[in-house]
Amino acid sequence: MQPPGGDAPAGCPFSGARAAQPAQAAHEAPHVPGEADAQAGWHNAQLDFSKSMSYGDYLSLNSILDAQHPLSPDHNEMLFIIQHQTSELWMKLALFELRGALDAVRTDALPPAFKMLARVSRILEQLVQAWNVLSTMTPSEYSAMRPYLGQSSGFQSYQYRQLEFLLGNKNAQMLQPHAHRPDILEQVRATLEAPSFYDEVVRLLARRGFPIAPERLERDWTQPMRHDETVEAAWLEVYRHPQQHWELYEMAEELVDLEDAFRQWRFRHVTTVERIIGFKQGTGGTSGAPYLRKMLDVVLFPELWHVRTTL
């Protein structure tokens, strides 16, 4: 169909005609990268590492890739080991970033802290996705290797325990699984006895002029946090006047992002456990899925969640 009042323009999609092409383009074949192109891309790369540090040297890959020692003849145990080892590496980075952010908050250097907190949230997203890989293991596959695990359990992860303590979920009884390793026990105990990240943020609120109750600012750091009205009142002021308290407003949202991601990690842990072992007791002696479901009720930053109802 032609538009009213004249011929269809060249190349009009409704005319049935094709637009004219340059004569040269009609005869040119598309360029297909060949061996010469590939050679040009790496021929200047260093190939001799007999006297210099290589990629594998820098990353200590020999040690990392030689750290998987399945105890069973079952094919699926390698997945189980690597899943947990990589999770421990991500937790190591999460602890490193959280402690860096904590140091920044103590010196009122909030922009660097925001960057580190955002990174921790992305790390937690990686940990959430990792459960999708482990969930490819079926109940029968796990049952074949479970007898070889003994009493070992993720419940005994000292990095996870430090992460919980650093985020404020304190419980002195959780030191006991590490009593057989004095070096590890000292690390975990130090995290238990120190202010959590959120404790330092509450101190920041006080430094910014908010009237925080003295008993909230100096307390027994080994005890879990409880909701504090003066802290919620401070956050209420921040949320009602974000332009006046922009850094604190951004801090609040970074913390909510962080706890949101942490909750998702916990939830995927529960569903993966239920999918693979159902409601059996955990290898470490916990009730398994019911224990993990109970942990879903733990709130790390209570005032930041409750203030949303008050607003």
UniProtKB/Swiss-Prot annotation:
Its cofactor is heme. InterPro entries: Trp/Indoleamine_2_3_dOase-like, Trp_2-3-dOase_bac, Trp_2_3_dOase. Its EC number is 1.13.11.11. It is an enzyme of class 1 (oxidoreductase). Residues 17-27 have a biased composition (Low complexity). GO terms for biological process: L-tryptophan catabolic process to acetyl-CoA; L-tryptophan catabolic process to kynurenine. Substrate binds at residues 80-84, 142, 146, 283. Pathway: Amino-acid degradation; L-tryptophan degradation via kynurenine pathway; L-kynurenine from L-tryptophan: step 1/2. Heme binds at residue 269. Disulfide bonds: none annotated. Residues 1-37 are annotated as: Disordered. GO terms for molecular function: heme binding; metal ion binding; tryptophan 2,3-dioxygenase activity. Homotetramer. Heme-dependent dioxygenase that catalyzes the oxidative cleavage of the L-tryptophan (L-Trp) pyrrole ring and converts L-tryptophan to N-formyl-L-kynurenine. Catalyzes the oxidative cleavage of the indole moiety. Belongs to the tryptophan 2,3-dioxygenase family. NCBIfam families: trp_2_3_diox. This is Tryptophan 2,3-dioxygenase. The gene is kynA.
